From Swiss-Prot:
Protein name: Kappa-casein
Protein family per UniProt: Belongs to the kappa-casein family.
Main location: secreted
Keyword rRNA processing applies: no
Site entry (Cleavage), positions: F58, M59
Pfam families in alphabetical order: Casein_kappa
Described purpose of this protein according to its UniProt entry: Kappa-casein stabilizes micelle formation, preventing casein precipitation in milk.
Region entry Disordered, spans: 98-122
Residue numbers carrying Phosphothreonine: T98
Gene Ontology biological-process annotations: lactation; protein stabilization
Amino acid sequence: VALINNQFLPYPYYAKPGAVRSPAQILQWQVLPNTVPAKSCQAQPTTLARHPHPRLSFMAIPPKKNQDKTDIPTINTIATVESTITPTTEAIVDTVATPEASSEVIESAPETKTDQVTSTVV
């Protein structure tokens, strides 16, 4: 078993050779001879041809996951909720505008009165 380390793989793969075809049937790169060089082909290097669908002779199998993980104990997160009476204080604001008896328009701020009200929330 060969270990394949590649910078583009997130984790290493183990390669197991597989008998897909016999070695005589596996197509490899072949060099085509340039027997009759034409004037346009003389400057070109020797060309390579290969089968359009290459067959792989091995399979990449990811490693087994770590079996040494410890089990996380289950915790009962459902708890009974007891209702408690919590007093809340709310402010009630009464706004009263006092009209003036004279005919002149007097701009004054309205009087405000604040009462404390205590209520219980169940």
